[in-house]
Amino acid sequence: MKIFLQSSLPPGPNRRRGPQTRGHPRHKSASFRRSASSGSDTRDSRGRSRSPSSSRSRSRSRSRSPSGSHSRPRAPHVPDQETGRPPGGGGRRGSRDQQQGPGGPAPPSPGEVGTRSGPPETKAKGRLAELISAAYDPPVLLLQGCANTLKSFRRRTTQSYPHTFLCMSTSWTWASKTCTVKSGHRMLVAFVNSEQRTLFLATVKIPKGVTCLKGSFDGL
């Protein structure tokens, strides 16, 4: 004979229930894995975001490196041991300044007066420079007189005093219609320098009726 007993008490909270599966550790492990994966993702993203800045800083450092080479101090100019002149032609300028002097070209020495036989290479600037340049012009004498008198004077001087002058011209006259000085013939006598002209005037006798004028040309 079987008797079934039923309890009238409702199941309480402290009453043990049947076997249950433990789900809490599984949820904790899954959440831990998610947090770990999210941490690794953030690290990767941070590393990627930092990589361009590091590359930029490297490129800036490389671009700044050539500028550092330009800031190196230059070596001082050392004058040449043989000539004692600094590079760049500084000595030449000094020599030119010494030759020209403070006011322009230097005047010629007494032996250089009238020694130029050709036209000047450059045009002189200023009155003083023109006078100095004219000092190198070969001196001449302009003789004016009768044609026969000038011809005989040239023949006699060429035979007796050839060392007192450089050259003589033939007798000539002005042919222009506008010229007012047509009376008489003229003849030019050229010299090496002013000293030779002084010697010519002191040695050779000028005939009567012949006038003599001093002058100079840029060239002969």
Swiss-Prot record:
Pfam families xrefs: PPV_E2_C (PF00511)
Disulfide bonds: none
One GO cellular component, as annotated: host cell nucleus
A GO MF term: DNA binding
Protein name (Swiss-Prot/TrEMBL): Protein E8^E2C
Annotated spans, Disordered: 1-123
Organism lineage: Viruses, Monodnaviria, Shotokuvirae, Cossaviricota, Papovaviricetes
Function: Plays a role in limiting the replication of viral DNA in keratinocytes. Recruits the host NCoR/SMRT complex to viral replication foci to mediate repression of both viral replication and transcription.
